[in-house]
Structures are given as structure tokens and as C-alpha cells.
Amino acid sequence: MREYFMKTMRIGFSNWNAADMDLAAQLWGESDVTRFICSTGIFTEEDIMDRLNTEIHNHDLYQIQYWPIFELSTEELIGCCGIRPFQSQPNCYELGLHLRKKFWGLGYASEASKAAIDYSFHILKANKLFAGHHPQNNASEKLLLKLGFQSIGKKYYAPTGLYHPSYELENH
């Protein structure tokens, strides 16, 4: 049974570890998930391992990551949602979310994002959060606006080679 450090009504938040390659492959091996994350739209096995190691490294250094999230009723991997340090801005983090396709449209994105925002502002005392999305990812745009993020223009995102609509959410 997986241990969770944070829960919502339906979601358990855990931490990635080196034994999670199979789970990472379930998520980042799905082209519907990765098509908005990188320029090729597909993660190789090496890309998946690199991504998993990046998340583990972020946890080791900062005690945060894009945490693996699980459906509490089934313990099935939904995807990941969390935060990472954002550039050199003090006390500012980037919110990120990747969900397996079978969990799209069920409210998990909003539920998980709200928990990550609450954690950022109340536990970490973040001043603000940054978020961006692929220009063609309309669902992410709708989610960020629903969560209260404000548009700040577009920022270049090297993994896709595109300028991504970008947003900030201030901690009031």
C-alpha cells in the first residue's frame, strides 16, 4: 500500500522514488499526455527515466516535486501534480499537472491543483505560483483561469520550442 503525505476527497499524494519506473512509464509513456510536453510529443524510455530522476532530485533538494497522485478508491495512478522551484524568483514555484487520459474530464485536475496550491501557499508560504501550458492545450487554459491564475503573456518553453501562454497566482 502506498503512503500519502496529503489527501483530498478522492486523491492521495505520494512521492516518486527509484522503484517507480513502471508507474512513470504508465504516465509519461502515454502520447496523449506527452504531446504537449516535448517537441516530439513522445517520451522515450530514456526520457521517462530522466523525468523520474528529475522529480526525485527535486524532492531531495527542495522537498517538492510533481507528486504522483493516486485514486484513493482504487490506488490507481491518476498522474502527477505538484510544484517545483521557478527560475530564480524567491518563494515562487511552478505548478504542474500531467494526467493519464482515462482520468481526463472527471474533475481530478481541479481537485489535485487546488490541493497543490493550498500546500504551496499554506505550508511553503509561497508568494506566488507560475503556470504555463502548450498553446494548443485548451483544457489547461480553462483550468488555470478557473483556479484564479492571471495571464502574464507568453514565455518560451525550450522542451517544445514554442512560446507558451503563462500565468501567475498571487498569495493574498
What are these regions (language model features)?
Residues M1-F36, Y66, F70-H172:
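Acyl-donor (CoA/ACP) binding surface of acyl/acetyltransferases
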Residues D32-T54, Q65:
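Conserved GNAT-fold acetyl-CoA-binding loop/helix
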Residues F43-D47, E55-H57, F70-E71, H98-R100:
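Juxtamembrane/interface motifs at transmembrane-helix termini
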Residues N58-Y62:
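Short loop/turn motifs at secondary-structure junctions and domain boundaries
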